[in-house]
Amino acid sequence: MLLSPSLLLLLLLGAPRGCAEGVAAALTPERLLEWQDKGIFVIQSESLKKCIQAGKSVLTLENCKQANKHMLWKWVSNHGLFNIGGSGCLGLNFSAPEQPLSLYECDSTLVSLRWRCNRKMITGPLQYSVQVAHDNTVVASRKYIHKWISYGSGGGDICEYLHKDLHTIKGNTHGMPCMFPFQYNHQWHHECTREGREDDLLWCATTSRYERDEKWGFCPDPTSAEVGCDTIWEKDLNSHICYQFNLLSSLSWSEAHSSCQMQGGTLLSITDETEENFIREHMSSKTVEVWMGLNQLDEHAGWQWSDGTPLNYLNWSPEVNFEPFVEDHCGTFSSFMPSAWRSRDCESTLPYICKKYLNHIDHEIVEKDAWKYYATHCEPGWNPYNRNCYKLQKEEKTWHEALRSCQADNSALIDITSLAEVEFLVTLLGDENASETWIGLSSNKIPVSFEWSNDSSVIFTNWHTLEPHIFPNRSQLCVSAEQSEGHWKVKNCEERLFYICKKAGHVLSDAESGCQEGWERHGGFCYKIDTVLRSFDQASSGYYCPPALVTITNRFEQAFITSLISSVVKMKDSYFWIALQDQNDTGEYTWKPVGQKPEPVQYTHWNTHQPRYSGGCVAMRGRHPLGRWEVKHCRHFKAMSLCKQPVENQEKAEYEERWPFHPCYLDWESEPGLASCFKVFHSEKVLMKRTWREAEAFCEEFGAHLASFAHIEEENFVNELLHSKFNWTEERQFWIGFNKRNPLNAGSWEWSDRTPVVSSFLDNTYFGEDARNCAVYKANKTLLPLHCGSKREWICKIPRDVKPKIPFWYQYDVPWLFYQDAEYLFHTFASEWLNFEFVCSWLHSDLLTIHSAHEQEFIHSKIKALSKYGASWWIGLQEERANDEFRWRDGTPVIYQNWDTGRERTVNNQSQRCGFISSITGLWGSEECSVSMPSICKRKKVWLIEKKKDTPKQHGTCPKGWLYFNYKCLLLNIPKDPSSWKNWTHAQHFCAEEGGTLVAIESEVEQAFITMNLFGQTTSVWIGLQNDDYETWLNGKPVVYSNWSPFDIINIPSHNTTEVQKHIPLCALLSSNPNFHFTGKWYFEDCGKEGYGFVCEKMQDTSGHGVNTSDMYPMPNTLEYGNRTYKIINANMTWYAAIKTCLMHKAQLVSITDQYHQSFLTVVLNRLGYAHWIGLFTTDNGLNFDWSDGTKSSFTFWKDEESSLLGDCVFADSNGRWHSTACESFLQGAICHVPPETRQSEHPELCSETSIPWIKFKSNCYSFSTVLDSMSFEAAHEFCKKEGSNLLTIKDEAENAFLLEELFAFGSSVQMVWLNAQFDGNNETIKWFDGTPTDQSNWGIRKPDTDYFKPHHCVALRIPEGLWQLSPCQEKKGFICKMEADIHTAEALPEKGPSHSIIPLAVVLTLIVIVAICTLSFCIYKHNGGFFRRLAGFRNPYYPATNFSTVYLEENILISDLEKSDQ
């Protein structure tokens, strides 16, 4: 009897040991496939053929055939490796990294739990990799390389099972991804679970411990695709379509797209006005903008639905911009607007709607019939194709004239129903030398709905880039098709174009297809499937598949073959060999030659993460995604075969070889034998770095594209080109055209210029990086995936025979060559040395100076290529006086020389001599300056690499109470009594009386000094700037340094009332309140507003010739700040040595988690004057960073965008800014700290359950499920009362910060929510409804006049700015309910430590007792679940009732049956 997969999982993973010991069982191939489908695998040593087994304290290698649950592994969140049997994660202990590896709690902060797989190696942080010791224990080491494979997969890579984020649905975390593993009910779950739910729905936690954080959501359930619409979908009974409204989620477009796909659905597509009205009615009470599947992420096509639905109905907002440079390439639907469709940046985070058909007729069925060959007969002058006849009319007419002309000929304007018909149209237009034609598609409706003129259904669309472009205020729109790709464009119907008529033809018998029996025809070829499984060598021999395996030349032929193999696919894992191979392991895939000349690769159609490696052969996939290509082992793998031969009596096409002799135009570069030219656009030559799409558009302005590599030789040239321009130590990154943005491309990487992908460019390290859809190139032949919205330099590519366009904004310059921060101009004509000195000076440059061997090599390589007959070139060396030493003419010192020592210098006192460089040897010599030679000019970068030296200042003294900093005195004034806090005018008056002004902050270090002194304060401080002249400080100095908040209030378009906005002087504050502005940031506020501190400055007193004590006394090695202890280590050391040195001092390498401590360390580092190591590091080339002490924090302080990409370990420079570099680099010091102790929660209360979900903060519970509901103030107040709660009140800054953090996840979907405030007529003040005063308030520019509050205005919170605003009470807004949490007396459970930690005996005995009790309890639970539930003290996931007709049940948190029974 066969066991089900779920029962197999139970048997292998085993019940708890108290009930039944997990039995060892042989892993058959069938069982292994079942585990691998779940992402579970066994790790086998490739060389030793043994498998890793997790023991109680160490990992060992054991016989794979005696496999058990302790050999089962799974990739989990944050690049963790989870052991199923040991229920722990593989960890690396920094304090003893080369001890045997062990399992740890999966949220342990004591070790590193992050691992990467790359080229069959498992690598951890600091270049440690998983190795095997002599005693078969598994260790981490940096000395050797050990390769690991997945047991039972034929040498497969464990990277094939990398974890992919699973974004939750509904729940209470706004669509955050599941955290695997997560702990619930004292067990670690590595996948979604149904445990604790009566409705049997899958759920997961989004943090590592559910009981602690209560953050959760439902899992996308792939099985729901088989059962139709379950309880988290809503069904439209008229259309039999299901919709899932994820209105409380906040995901990027690609994340939302993935979430829908995981459930067997797609992002919303809207096919007609009826469907749009259904969606609008369902969201009528919401003011929300949601993602739908509309996108233009295919670089070669226009707008499309992500589910492939034809796009013929549109309801664009008039605001939509169709310009090519606009980054908004994903579509949204707004329920509150009549023209509801907009375009947004795809990286924005929004709610989304999924859609799933119950009885959808797959378009592939229609496509399959469209590719079937039908021999057709037509009248003379008409072109036959698959049952129809077509005629191109070469007389230009308007669309309506063309329509009438076809009708007069008993035909109709052409309708296009499939990609097969597009192929015919492209061929017909090409044969007739026509570039564009009318087709029968048009619209005369608002909203736009395109229809065919013959009334046939629109089942296929093929829009051109940026189309369909809807013209405003024009009801009649007509459509044309262009020749190159057959794409469609919206046109003015009055334009005059050629047109094609179409009518039915006469179908002939199949015998006239021209193919042998059993073969199918497409174009000029016949195709057949050999269904016998063979190796590639057998299939490609020409015997079984005469004359050869199939070669595929374009997307039309691929679509035909996909339809062909769909008819024979019977098995789950069927594959078909094609002729593509790399059997010689060259690194480049080519078509296996038949005869002498190989066929060029013109098209590829890879599956996700393919080609996975070099040296393989290619098979086409027979299951979803159907038709995609994958690399397989040429000899061991067996597949069916796809055969191809020309139609009988048809000549085989000859491929013309084009030899690219045309030179590159302007300053584009190439080398002999390459068909394209390249140009590097680096930051020294352009105004700004750009996103991937901006860079592609930039290249397109020249008629080019981002660079692609058609052959390995092109990649080698680009690599050398970068090496020739930049220092090899620079970690520069350049956008190239490699991307996987197109959602219809199955996650496959492609080139933006449609160059076929012929090599395995990306390491399998990045297979799990789904969100990074664009690639950069580094000068070490490395491609790295990044977010497409990142800004980088870029490389463009253009064919040799295409002359680049010159954009209007392009400033042409003579072709200077860039090399390492300077540019060089090579003058090939000969002249005297003095003439060239003048020419170079006129070009704002100097005659060439050479200061290094690298520069010498660069110059020699260039002049050697440019010179004829071994010419010598003038350089900037001149003998200033006869027989004197040679000096550089620009005055720089001669620090490098390359004289020809074998050449005698001629002594001639009568004439001056100048230096030259030989193009043959590269050696220097001297000659009379009047001799004519070619020469080189050199110009340096315009910016200086170091600051100008100021005149030394004298240290002085400051009055008592003032702080000395940087030659001036500062006074920080924040009285303890809030009633003494000042407005800006009073603060400036106070400073003036003290002989100073409000502070002028002149540098980042001074900013840090002030910020560090604000630690513990809760109010912001006035500084010396006003909005009427924010470029000049109050003391008259220009603003050379600024630190404005991104939410600076001066940029906010509207405030409380129109009157408030008029004539309000604004003054600058430095924030010490992170609730509304980032710590230390500047923002404007009403100058007259009281309630702030201030900072004064005045000049130091130098009359006493004071001495700065910081110059006299060294910085102490131990420093205290903000409840932390820091230790400064002064020694040359690597990052690894810094880790060990800190441990020796009973500390750890520092982690920095907020701006206050960062500011303190900035001041310290500036005082020390050199860089220090900090505890940040990366194991994945800068994609993720971790703190070595296990601290989790989102705070960063990078120098710039690229500073995080220059190495694996991080240091802070003398200005406190962070840079990454190689971990083996030596720095002069490191900063250690003693990590603060973590406390248990001070608020153990829990939230009661009603019909809406709650999130706990401190001793209160909040429901955010109503923020998208639009209700009046009174209706919202009544709703909360019915739930036993009240409308939102905000009592302190911590609560305010919590609320803004939670609301931030809603993005732009929520603008305002009601606050539970009222007007007290007795004393004319605003109070909370419970009677307490509104001590915590934030009215923005000015508190409103209470006259406006009587009697029809209420208070709302503006989410984007965190400001309060008066609004009419009858307006409809979202709201938040709030109530006090219930008292919960259960004690917190202790955390589990590492499995090999040394534990005191008493604790060990206690744990043994606990384990025994838990084991016994589990057995009792299996036999008597009711008894166990009565004993339970933990929280189970439970819904009071499963009913999703209301949004309020979207986020019910998980409660226990025990609590339910008490309600």
From Swiss-Prot:
Disulfide feature: C51-C64, C89-C106, C178-C204, C192-C219, C260-C354, C330-C346, C406-C501, C478-C493, C617-C634, C699-C796, C774-C788, C840-C937, C914-C929, C1067-C1087, C1209-C1223, C1280-C1377, C1354-C1369
Superkingdom to which the source organism belongs: Eukaryota
Protein keywords: Cell membrane, Disulfide bond, Endocytosis, Glycoprotein, Lectin, Membrane, Receptor, Repeat, Secreted, Signal, Transmembrane, Transmembrane helix
Domain Fibronectin type-II, residue spans: 173-221
Spans within the Extracellular topological domain: 21-1397
Primary localisation category: membrane
SMART domains: CLECT, FN2, RICIN
Alphabetical list of Gene3D superfamilies matching this protein: 2.80.10.50, Fibronectin, type II, collagen-binding, Mannose-Binding Protein A, subunit A
InterPro entries per UniProt: C-type_lectin-like, C-type_lectin-like/link_sf, C-type_lectin/snaclec_domain, C-type_lectin_CS, CTDL_fold, FN_type2_dom, FN_type2_sf, Ricin_B-like_lectins
Glycosylation sites: N93, N454, N1123
GO terms, biological process: negative regulation of arachidonate secretion; oxidative stress-induced premature senescence; positive regulation of arachidonate secretion; positive regulation of cytokine production; positive regulation of DNA damage response, signal transduction by p53 class mediator; positive regulation of podocyte apoptotic process; reactive oxygen species metabolic process; receptor-mediated endocytosis
Membrane-protein topology: Single-pass type I membrane protein
Function, in words: Receptor for secretory phospholipase A2 (sPLA2). Acts as a receptor for phospholipase sPLA2-IB/PLA2G1B but not sPLA2-IIA/PLA2G2A. Also able to bind to snake PA2-like toxins. Although its precise function remains unclear, binding of sPLA2 to its receptor participates in both positive and negative regulation of sPLA2 functions as well as clearance of sPLA2.
Name of protein: Secretory phospholipase A2 receptor
